[in-house]
Amino acid sequence: PGQVKLIFQPAEEGAPPGEEGGAELMVKEGVLKNPDVDAIFGLHVWSGLYAGQVYLRPEGIMAAVNEFRIDLKGVQTHGSTPWTGKDPIVTAAQIVNSLQTIVSRSLPLTEAGAVVTIGSIHGGVRSNIIPEDLYMLGTIRTLDNGMKATVLKRLEEIVYNVAKSNNIEANITYLVSYPITFNDPYLYEEILPTLERVNGKKNVHLMKAITGAEDFSYFQEKVPGTYFFIGGQKTDVDLSTVAPHHTPDFYVDDSAISTGIRSMVGLTLDYIFNN
């Protein structure tokens, strides 16, 4: 005998700016209490894998994410006399290039992966005016907490020192932040036979960690958990032609639903009867 709690979570992709949401808020509001949760399981469909296939790994399976905003403030001037102002655009270019040295020159990449990406730059309105203000938006993905600390430290060193060298004011604001999605190794070993039994051993695969992120990690910070992926593509489709997630042509075949149901029901029943 045991109890099963189903969590219906909003805002998996993050709450609107300035608001709380998703798994972090649910944990704060007591979703893992009354009754207390002993273990948690989650899954994610993947369009680039064949339906009927299950992929997982022990320990880190998805990266931590730290999204950030960099604000630069200079002195506006005419583009024909740049020496009369302070140029945030040139400074931004230097910062973007320098940030790419964090991964290539400051991290032991044979141990774990990391990504630093600037995805958006906003500044200026005319070709012949150097603007006063500029801001950039970026994301950091790390698969190791030590690397995460190093990347954040180097980010601040680079931004503030490059800005200072150009007489520019700089400020970093941290936005969305998710921990590493970490599969408890003991729970992983306990549930692996279940997944192999209900799906067929040949259909369950050990995967490499990926640099996507998932706020399911907030649940795993509180209780042992395992997160895994199921395929969602027809077996007669060339996977190299499949549209990725978050694109207009994204498609998942309905046959994936049975894999998900079979896996979650099997995990739930086996965990309850074995514990």
Language model regions located:
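Histidine/acidic-residue-rich, glycine-tolerant segments that coordinate divalent metal ions
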Residues: 1-120, 125-131
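Metal-dependent amide/peptide-bond hydrolase catalytic core
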Residues: 93-275
